[in-house]
Amino acid sequence: RIVFIKINPEIAIAEIDKKTKQKKYNWNIEIKNYLSDLGYIKLKDNLNFEAKFPKYNGILHLKKFDLKTLDKNTRNKINKAKNKGLNFEKASFNELPILYEFIKRKKEKSLTYYQEYFKVFDRTAIDLFLVSLDTAEFLNNAKKLYDEELKKNSELVANLNKMKNEKKLNLKMNSDQKLLNYKNYLLEAQNKIKKSEKIYIGGALVLKYKNRINIIISGYDQNYKRFNPNYLLHYEIFNYYKKNYAFADMNGITGDFKKENPYYGLNKFKLGFKPKIYEFIGEYDLPIFPFLYKWNLKNGKLAKRLNRKNLKKTVLN
């Protein structure tokens, strides 16, 4: 039995100024009243990711996309990634297990889920991209990091011998840990070269529809975060599609732009590509059987089925 219908219309009600973060509302906001008159129940404003779908999003105009227009920090990270030997490549269905290793902790979905998801769409409608690390460049980088830290460590040992204190001891211990990490990187790089293995460190699934693309999900190996794979991945994706598509959907941001926001890093990353920021009308439920809807909501059954722990709290009375 259908208890209710959920909608999440792609109707932008405001554009948000990139600098001031002030909202400029348009006439679409009146649609809220029409929906209410029709019996739709508005869910509480989704400032972060409390609801099933994000209420705020960045839309990138691909025709205007250029490295020079990006945030300075974003440009620097992209250029560093290029200099560190990262490679961007289009992959096939058979490489989905590689991507899955980078995204399996983001959502409680199995590899089979993504494989079936991939098969649902026409082959021309969905793409898989991967970022790999050149093993020779990785070896050079690992050796450089190790040698630099070894030099620092020797200096810390000399200073510690002259005068011991807690601060110097902590610095030495931190340096020891870094040395161990860099040594492991070095050994890993040497083993990869011996086995002629490619090191994949990031990837994304992209859906194409009409004049736009949507990055469905992306991820990267945290062990290689210093190589900035996520920055290069998104930059190359936008470049890849800019000739044939007009817009790129950034797949959601939060409406809280304060540094204290736990999602501040995510916002900063996505907004560094200079998309236009929009607030959308949000989610609405249309109860078909109001009594059953309220009963299921009160008992938490809707939250369980929709996998939303705080659903009961997000509905306005």
Model regions and ranges:
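A conserved beta-strand-loop-helix scaffold within acyl/acetyltransferase catalytic domains
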Residues: 26, 38-225
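Conserved GNAT acetyl-CoA-binding A-motif
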Residues: 2-18, 241-254
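Flexible, glycine-rich phosphate/dinucleotide-binding loops
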Residues: 14, 137-138, 257
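Aromatic/hydrophobic pocket-lining residues that form π-stacking "cages" and hydrophobic walls in ligand
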Residues: 77, 237, 266
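Active-site/acyl-donor-binding loops of N-acyltransferases
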Residues: 18-29, 35-65, 247-317
